[in-house]
Amino acid sequence: FAQTKSTKIIVDGVCMMCEERIEKNIIGLKGIKLANWNLENRILKLVYNEKKISLDEIHKFLASIGHDTNKEIASNQAYNLLDPCCQYRDFQVVKDHGLDRKPIHGSNKKEQ
């Protein structure tokens, strides 16, 4: 069991669709044992086998499906594929979800 590690990653998102996308996609990766993303604090709790997948690979994968992490920024192309409801870089979308926060890496749309 020495290869199994627990970690927490900050992953941006604003709704239950984001939660489902993040958890369902990440759990499908080889080496991921557990994935649980919290909408309120944006923390993804992971248990993974470091011999099968690295933390860097996990960050890159999350960015590839459109979600910024505390270490990796999703390309505009990947981000723009998200449902409009999930576009967490847009202040109005965040506000519409009843949230009062900025994206992890700042915003590319008008804020307040």
Which ranges hold each PLM region?
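Short, solvent-exposed mixed-charge patches
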Residues: 110-112
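Periplasmic N-terminal soluble interaction domains immediately after the signal peptide in Gram-negative
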Residues: 37-77
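Short, low-order "capping/linker" segments at domain edges
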Residues: 79-105
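N-terminal targeting signals for Sec/Tat export/insertion, comprising classic cleavable signal peptides
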Residues: 8-47, 51-52
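Bacterial Sec-dependent N-terminal signal peptides
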Residues: 1-8
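Short, low-complexity, polar/charged sequence segments that are solvent-exposed and flexible
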Residues: 27-31, 54, 63-67, 90-91
